[in-house]
């Protein structure tokens, strides 16, 4: 159960950075403030394969902030696997690889809503305070592939923090088209709690 909205960005618009400011005055446990649910431009792969897709048509990844059931507050960034089919019908699966942080105890592959990789990092975001999430694409110095970094800026302290970064396994990738954001309750026992989010 969640409430969602879309940033109306034309489908052919490509961009390398994505910034959202948000505040959650009420964020009980079981709250997910998803600030980006986006599509990546994989035209580099589309020139090499007959078919390129992710588990959900038009959605490549998502990121935001959660308040877990035990009260722990975290950031999350996820990328779905990319399935590339060649002319012979052979399928190559490309999974993003985390390059920062070097290790966390909550970094893992995911399944259930498709398959892919996500990084969950402790970040003590507080109710009633403004934050900015900043996603940006760059180029890996070691692989030449596109890197996507997730940053957070705390307006109260003036501090910017790099939360995580992924090597997408493919060069020349950027964001494309509209992006969704949503406020979700992901724990049924807490579904009656009031939650808010402004973006």
Tell me what each language-model feature is.
Residues 109-120:
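Short acidic (Asp/Glu) patches
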Residues 1-105, 120:
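Secretory/extracellular carbohydrate-interaction modules
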Residues 163, 167-193:
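Flexible glycan-contacting loops in extracellular carbohydrate-active proteins
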Residues 95, 156, 161-169:
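N-terminal secretory-pathway/extracellular module detecting exported/lumenal segments
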Residues 13-17, 118, 126-128, 143:
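Short, surface-exposed loop/turn motifs at beta-strand boundaries within globular domains
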Residues 26, 81-85, 139, 156, ...:
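Short loop/turn segments at secondary-structure transitions that flank enzyme active sites
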Residues 197-199:
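Short, intrinsically disordered, charge-balanced linker/junction segments flanking boundaries
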Residues 125-162:
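Carbohydrate-binding surfaces in secreted/extracellular proteins
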